[in-house]
């Protein structure tokens, strides 16, 4: 048993990573905290603060570049103050960042921040003249030039979605509305929230061959394509493409996560960019909650387990839940099909009519899917599916079915070649 009397060590020669883990483990053994997660969090935050302080002191002593005197009490203590422009001192032509004044909610906005600019770390942005708070902001990114939105202590979340607006010229709002009309992020917004989103978007015109986002980088923008075409790469492999009405970058918007893919324009394109720092939490929380719910559900569907996580993300975003009462027909034999169904909860009965006689051929439960044959073959429904008790299904339209289920279409087609598989899998 490892105790504080017998310190834990990984190896005789330790790098920074193993040294940190060793120190954490020894402190844990010495203190035996009840809340392990909080203890670990406090440990790493403390170490980060110590490192930042050491860097700041060393850098100040060498170059005297930073003024550590607190000259303003206007900002919320968690908000990051504007960094100085060091381009003249270092002989490097950096693009100057013009930071706005804090608004009523203590937020700073980068007035001229271009979402298509290089998002790589800048050396001098690694140091802040503000002491590290006890807990970092949720959108904290080490070494990045960011605009941090903070909520005052004791205040309630504002109902308005977006606090950063770009007043749209005549006709621009209509263009944005057309571009986002079918986007999953904005389906459930009320009128006021919808207008806030429209006013928060900025137009970006990019030429052919432009890398809009790069895999692994940290980004703040979500993009909707108004016109043009773009290719999506994971590593060196092209996985999909985008055209008018398509969107990408939602991981940055919802989770502040690194870019999952690289997007490159294949023609001159017009994009609408939405900054995560001007998007209120309620928009992101609603979408994130829906995605988490569907991702958990999709992980139980055998057909979809082979999909990559980004593919499951896209499917989860496109799914919509529908409900049926006991005895209600979900699909009817002979009808034209335009929806694919996956059962979320409840049961359904598959009925097939032959020679004027209808008989039950299968019973479906959670995780079962049906409706794919009509979409694969542009054929009428092959059977009738009826709710057996209250039934909840996740649905996917025909276009989304073809676009998002590409990796499993071969599996579906192989199943459809066998009559018995058809009866077991599909109406």
UniProtKB/Swiss-Prot annotation:
Q: Give residue spans, biased composition: Acidic residues.
A: 110-124
Family according to the record = Belongs to the cAMP-dependent kinase regulatory chain family.
| Keyword Iron recorded | no
Question: Which Pfam families does this UniProt record tie to the protein?
Answer: cNMP_binding (PF00027), RIIa (PF02197)
Know the name of this protein? Answer: cAMP-dependent protein kinase regulatory subunit
Question: Binding residues for 3',5'-cyclic AMP 1, per the UniProt record?
Answer: 185-300
Q: Which UniProt keywords apply?
A: cAMP, cAMP-binding, Nucleotide-binding, Phosphoprotein, Repeat
Q: Which residues form a coiled coil?
A: none
Q: Region Disordered: start and end of each range? A: 96-145
For this protein's source organism, the top of the classification is: Eukaryota, Fungi, Fungi incertae sedis, Mucoromycota, Mucoromycotina
> InterPro entries of this UniProt entry?
cAMP-dep_PK_reg_su-like, cAMP_dep_PK_reg_su, cAMP_dep_PK_reg_su_I/II_a/b, cNMP-bd_CS, cNMP-bd_dom, cNMP-bd_dom_sf, RmlC-like_jellyroll
Q: Which GO terms describe its molecular function?
A: cAMP binding; cAMP-dependent protein kinase inhibitor activity; protein kinase A catalytic subunit binding
List ligand-binding residues for 3',5'-cyclic AMP 2.
Answer: 303-422
Q: How does it assemble?
A: Tetramer, composed of 2 regulatory (R) and 2 catalytic (C) subunits. In the presence of cAMP it dissociates into 2 active monomeric C subunits and an R dimer.
The answer on whether this UniProt entry bears the keyword Nucleotide-binding reads: yes
Q: Hey, what's the signal peptide range on this chain?
A: none
Got a GO cellular component term for this one? Answer: nucleus
Which organism is the protein's source?
Mucor circinelloides f. lusitanicus
Annotated stretches, region: Dimerization and phosphorylation:
38-184
For this protein, the record's CDD domains field holds:
CAP_ED, DD_R_ScPKA-like
């Amino acid at each position: 048993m490892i105790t504080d009397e017998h310190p834990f060590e990984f190896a005789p020669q330790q790098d920074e990573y193993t040294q940190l883990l060793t120190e954490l483990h020894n402190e844990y053994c010495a203190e035996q905290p009840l809340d392990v997660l909080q203890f670990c969090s406090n440990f790493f935050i403390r170490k980060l603060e110590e490192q930042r302080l050491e860097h700041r002191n060393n850098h100040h002593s060498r170059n005297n570049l930073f003024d550590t005197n607190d000259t303003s009490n206007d900002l919320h203590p968690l908000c990051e103050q504007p960094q100085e422009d060091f381009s003249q001192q270092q002989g490097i032509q950096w693009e100057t960042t013009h930071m706005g004044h804090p608004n009523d909610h203590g937020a700073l906005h980068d007035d001229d921040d271009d979402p298509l600019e290089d998002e790589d770390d800048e050396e001098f942005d690694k140091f802040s003249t503000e002491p590290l708070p006890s807990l970092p902001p949720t959108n904290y990114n080490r070494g990045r030039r960011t605009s941090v939105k903070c909520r005052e202590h004791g205040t309630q979340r504002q109902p308005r979605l977006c606090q950063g607006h770009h007043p749209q010229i005549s006709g621009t709002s209509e263009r944005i509305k057309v571009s986002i009309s079918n986007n999953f992020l904005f389906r459930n917004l009320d009128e006021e929230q919808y207008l806030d989103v429209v006013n928060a978007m900025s137009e970006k015109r990019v030429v052919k061959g432009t890398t809009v986002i790069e895999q692994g980088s940290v980004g703040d923008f979500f993009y909707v394509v108004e016109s043009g075409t773009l290719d999506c790469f994971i590593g060196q492999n092209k996985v999909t493409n985008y055209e008018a009405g398509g969107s990408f970058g939602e991981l940055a918007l919802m989770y502040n996560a690194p870019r999952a893919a690289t997007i490159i324009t294949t023609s001159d394109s017009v994009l609408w960019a939405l900054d995560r720092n001007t998007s209120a939490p309620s928009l992101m929380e609603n979408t994130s909650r829906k995605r988490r719910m569907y991702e958990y559900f999709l992980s139980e569907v055998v057909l979809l387990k082979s999909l990559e996580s980004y593919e499951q993300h896209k499917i989860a975003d496109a799914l919509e839940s529908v409900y049926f009462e006991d005895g209600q027909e979900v699909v009817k034999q002979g009808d034209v099909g335009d929806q694919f169904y996956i059962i979320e909860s409840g049961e359904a009965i598959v009925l097939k009519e032959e020679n004027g006689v209808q008989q039950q051929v299968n019973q479906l439960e959670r995780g079962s899917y049906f409706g794919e044959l009509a979409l694969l073959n542009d054929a009428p429904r092959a059977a009738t599916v009826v709710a057996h008790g209250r039934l909840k299904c996740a649905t996917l339209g025909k276009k989304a079915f073809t676009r998002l289920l590409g990796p499993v279409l071969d599996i579906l087609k192989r199943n459809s070649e066998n009559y018995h598989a058809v009866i077991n899998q599909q109406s």
